[in-house]
UniProtKB/Swiss-Prot annotation:
Membrane topology: Multi-pass membrane protein
Record gene name: MT-CYB
Domain of life: Eukaryota
Cofactor: binding details: Binds 2 heme b groups non-covalently.
Membrane-traversing stretches: 33-53, 77-98, 113-133, 178-198, 226-246, 288-308, 320-340, 347-367
Name used for this protein in its record: Cytochrome b
Function: Component of the ubiquinol-cytochrome c reductase complex (complex III or cytochrome b-c1 complex) that is part of the mitochondrial respiratory chain. The b-c1 complex mediates electron transfer from ubiquinol to cytochrome c. Contributes to the generation of a proton gradient across the mitochondrial membrane that is then used for ATP synthesis.
CDD domains, per database record: cytochrome_b_C, Cytochrome_b_N
Cofactors (names): heme b
Originating species: Microdipodops megacephalus (Dark kangaroo mouse)
Entry keywords, A to Z: Electron transport, Heme, Iron, Membrane, Metal-binding, Mitochondrion, Mitochondrion inner membrane, Respiratory chain, Transmembrane, Transmembrane helix, Transport, Ubiquinone
SUPFAM superfamilies in the record: a domain/subunit of cytochrome bc1 complex (Ubiquinol-cytochrome c reductase), Transmembrane di-heme cytochromes
């Protein structure tokens, strides 16, 4: 008699993906972030669904409906804090997941890597629209400034912005359509994540050594299911500590003031997870140039498979490339800090140097380091 998980059409799919899946025997904790991102997505969809039951996407009542959720709905304050901090946690896991992919050379799986970049863009779009819903000062002005960047596109820019706004400024129509998109996008992300997994299971997982592991594989269950479960427990412990003790740590206190189109905040900035890209945007004095640099700051990830010059896949035994990668991480942290500062000296020049260094490391220094390391191995 065949085991049900190997014969039932639905169970068979789950079995191939999560139970009998052959996995490298040496993958470390850095490979946990895929499952943690899945957990974050589930938290966001469930908490978002409950928030949508009480939220009204209308400029007159949006702010008071969020207040109503926090004050009158049973555990509404908890659901709202979970959703707001869940977004931050999502991006923390996402950036660590991308960092691991760069460090261990996982970008050589082209389809998996490119579907991951599409997932990143979708998640960023969802996060941006979610920021608008409380209809606080930073919601309104952040939406105005960021959407207005599209007006830099030649010829169609102004029409495009007015089409997105649904009028001549960010208003009720904008909030309504953002709510519709924000509701549907997580389900598109979930579908895209399944495509991402499909591509990954075509090739199998990479490992810290960056070498083929076909000769030494173990079943995913129970080894990596247990490992993933431990990661989830640790993640949830960190998450609920943040939600219950310091829910506004990563938020913007300006958003506790209702949106006022007549009063511009002294410093308009997006959420912390977009600050590095925002700093790159601001470092270029030209509007169109800034928008191009903003898009390229994420799209440059797609070039990694094409600018790989080293014979070794992983950075584990490549000290020069390791140094450059950690230099890039430091640079992104500096850009994140700069993005949250006002546009005045010395922040302007620091942002410009950090932006130049970001592209220089990825496009020039890392490929050169790879070629040098090839020569060093031959010695």
């Amino acid at each position: 008699m065949t085991i049900m998980r190997k014969s039932h059409p639905l169970m068979k799919m789950v079995n191939h993906a999560f139970i009998d899946l052959p996995a490298p025997s040496n993958i470390s904790g850095w490979w946990n972030f895929g499952s943690l991102l899945g957990l974050c997505l589930i938290i966001q969809i469930v908490s978002g669904l409950f928030l949508a039951m009480h939220y009204t996407p209308d400029t007159l009542t949006a702010f008071s409906s969020v207040t109503h959720i926090c004050r009158d709905v049973n555990y509404g304050w908890l659901i709202r804090n979970m959703h707001a901090n869940g977004a931050s946690l999502f991006f923390i896991c996402l950036y660590l997941h991308i960092g691991r992919g760069i460090y261990y050379g996982s970008y050589t799986y082209m389809e998996t890597w490119n579907s991951g970049i599409i997932l990143l863009f979708l998640t960023m779009a969802t996060g941006f629209m979610g920021k608008v819903f409380p209809w606080g000062q930073m919601s309104f002005w952040g939406a105005t400034v960021i959407t207005n960047l599209l007006s830099a596109i030649p010829y169609i820019g102004t029409d495009l912005v007015e089409w997105i706004w649904g009028g001549f400024s960010v208003d009720k129509a904008t909030l309504n359509r953002f709510f519709a998109f924000h509701f549907i996008l997580p389900f598109i992300i979930a579908a895209m994540a399944m495509v991402h997994l499909l591509f990954l299971h075509e090739t199998g997982s990479n490992n810290p050594l960056g070498i083929p592991s076909d000769c030494d594989k173990i079943p995913f269950h129970p080894y990596y299911t247990t490992k993933d479960f431990l990661g989830m427990v640790l993640l949830l412990a960190f998450f609920f500590t943040m939600v219950l003790i310091s829910p506004d740590l990563l938020g913007d206190l300006d958003n506790y003031s209702p949106a006022n189109p007549l009063n511009t905040p002294p410093h308009i900035k997006p959420e912390w997870y977009f600050l590095f890209a925002y700093a790159i945007l601001r470092s270029i004095p030209n509007k169109l140039g800034g928008v191009v640099a903003l898009v390229l700051s994420i799209l440059v990830l797609a070039l990694f498979p094409h600018i790989q010059t080293a014979n070794q896949r992983s950075l584990m035994f490549r000290p020069i490339s390791q140094f450059l990668l950690w230099m890039m991480v430091s640079d992104v942290l500096i850009l994140t800090w700069i993005g949250g500062q006002p546009v005045e000296p010395p922040f302007i020049i620091i942002g410009q140097v950090a932006s130049l260094l970001y592209f220089l490391i990825i496009l020039a220094l890392m490929p050169i380091a790879g070629l040098n390391e090839n020569k060093m191995i031959k010695w």
